[in-house]
């Protein structure tokens, strides 16, 4: 059985809250929702599915704890891993760097041999620019809980459903498969 680990970097608690919400919707226990500042190579090795969440700070900068987290990921064997990204940003005040932190992590892991899932269309977002967008798709779930908090739950639900559908063909621990209703 494969395990899902959720690693997040959060300075104000928003990304942590999003990570916990995603965990709840996927049935991932709280013990597998980990602050990236505590992440090490053994933890990365333990999970075959990694959900990586970050906020974006300043002028498109990665959340501080992720700088060491990215080093751990680069030193880890990610070839057999399935990875999904989620990011928090402010599309109004920082419309030119919306969710760039997620794009930075993507750039650092994209050539590692991992399988990246959970891309989201950028068409329903209002922003100017983001390095987290490639060919009209965010590299993961982009959230603006400051200006579009009314869309957060719906966006998380759609993304979690996409992740579940992708992973449904393989048996994973902690994964609650979608029901037909």
Question: What is each PLM-predicted segment?
Answer:
Residues 3, 25, 29, 34, ...:
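FMN-binding flavodoxin-like domain, especially the glycine-rich phosphate-binding loop
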Residues 14, 18, 155, 173:
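Charged catalytic carboxylate motif
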Residues 35-40:
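Short acidic loop-to-helix transition motifs that present clustered carboxylates
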Residues 145, 179-181:
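Compositionally biased non-globular segments, especially hydrophobic aliphatic-rich helices
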Residues 173-179:
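Conserved small/polar residues in nucleotide/adenosyl-binding loops
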